[in-house]
Every structure is written in C-alpha cells, then in structure tokens.
From Swiss-Prot:
UniProt entry tagged with the keyword Electron transport: yes
Family according to the record: Belongs to the complex I subunit 3 family.
Keyword Protein biosynthesis included in the entry's annotation: no
Enzyme Commission number(s): 7.1.1.2
Subcellular localization: Mitochondrion membrane
Principal location class: mitochondrion
Catalyzed reactions per annotation: a ubiquinone + NADH + 5 H(+)(in) = a ubiquinol + NAD(+) + 4 H(+)(out)
Top-rank taxon: Eukaryota
Membrane topology: Multi-pass membrane protein
Membrane-crossing residue ranges in chain numbering: 10-30, 64-84, 88-108
Protein name, entry field: NADH-ubiquinone oxidoreductase chain 3
Disulfide bonds, paired cysteine numbers: none
Keywords assigned: Electron transport, Membrane, Mitochondrion, NAD, Respiratory chain, Translocase, Transmembrane, Transmembrane helix, Transport, Ubiquinone
Organism of provenance: Patiria pectinifera (Starfish)
Length: 116
C-alpha cells in the first residue's frame, strides 16, 4: 500500500513537471518561430470596424444604445441568479419572476424591436 502511494506521488510530480516543461517549450517556440514580416495591414490599428483616420465622434443609433443597455441589465441580473439556489432569505421564484416581467415590459414597449 505504501509502495503504490509513493509511485502515485512520483507519477503526479513527473506529469506536473512534464506539463510545465512542454508548456514552457511551446511558449518559447511561439515567441521565436513566427516570421517578423510587418506590413501596413498588420501594423495599422483596428478599432471594432471603425476607420481610425476619421473622427472618433461618429454618431450611432439610439436603438443600438438601448439594446446594449438592456443587454447589460439582463446580463447583470442573470449573473445575480447564480447564487440564488443557495439563498435562504429570498424565495427562488421572485428573481426570475421580476426578470420575466421586465422582459415582457420591454417587449410590449417596443424596446427590443430593432427596425421600425
């Protein structure tokens, strides 16, 4: 029993060191192997599809802003749902009910309609 435990510990250590060495080798290989050809396309900045040579004050649709804010709001509320099964003080049906009512309200008000 003691002998197999020592072998298991040795194999665990060996595999850990082997994984570390392989990862280090791949990291150094990725750093030294790529070609250093820089052209105008690779060295030019790219900002989410906007041309960086024009004005940075390009107006965009208020509808896009509204959908982005709604996404952040519902995303935050979904993130708050994760600890809900462990909650003792709050009944688990209240938060999904509030989320559903908010979603239905936005749907009825037309906040989720992209094209008018």
């Amino acid at each position: 029993m003691i002998y197999t435990n020592n072998i298991f510990n040795f194999l665990t250590l060996f595999v850990s060191i082997l994984i570390f060495l392989i990862t280090t080798l791949i990291t150094f290989a990725a750093h030294f192997l790529p070609s250093r050809n820089t052209d105008s396309e690779k060295s030019s900045p790219y900002e989410c599809g906007f041309d960086p040579l024009n004005s940075a004050r390009v107006p965009f649709s208020f509808r896009f802003f509204l959908v982005a804010i709604l996404f952040l709001l519902f995303d935050l509320e979904i993130a708050l749902l994760f600890p809900l099964p462990f909650s003792v003080f709050f009944h688990p049906i209240h938060t999904p009910l509030i989320l559903t009512v908010g979603l239905i309200f936005e749907w009825v008000q037309g906040g989720l309609d992209w094209a008018e």
